[in-house]
């Protein structure tokens, strides 16, 4: 691939985008290191996700390989070519298991395939979840402490002058903030079927659970921001809640939206627009979210 020609076009497009007159829609890719681990051609050592999550040296090596792969092989409207990377930026990467694990779910590892979390309560034990106060009183404990340990490991490797194919490490990414969303986390804890049913047949419990989850999200975000030297409230805040695609607009507006608003009030000043990531058929929510 002619990186020089590609990058020349990208620089022109970026300049046009800055001026608000881009000649075409820019093509972007959202990617993460699971692309390396899950592909036997890219992961001949068959490093598993369990090894990746638990060993910061392995995590660093995989992320270096991933950033090289993105720069060399995955075409999109960004500057490409490993030689054009100024540095490699590692970050503690716990995929989508962090928040479930924070609240008591066991991580389910599947070799080189994406890990998940196991439902940790059923109809008879779901009230026990609310008795676990550690996510509220010790938001930097448990798996979050492992995340911070990995962060410090990456900082130390940078200070020691670690390089990958001549590229130094940049400042590690500040991971663990944001959220997959209160209702999505509820589905992880008690299962999607139970969560949807309880919105109708045990609404008092679901409101208590969603408030508990939201408070835990707020506590973790504020604690990590303090740890990273950031203000407790940012100018804007973005989050996800993919599982609201299971709900009607009326149910979302009445029962879930108040918790989204609570997170926004607690975690941002509103000086800049916020955003939400949604999967599936979510277009029915858009007008309400914009308002």
Per-region residue spans from a language model:
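A contiguous, low-structure linker/loop signature
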Residues: 84-130
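Generic hydrophobic/packing signal
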Residues: 63, 72-74, 78, 119-129, ...
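Active-site loop segments of alpha/beta catalytic cores
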Residues: 1-52, 56-60, 134-291
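Low-complexity, flexible helical/coil segments
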Residues: 62-69, 114-122, 209-212
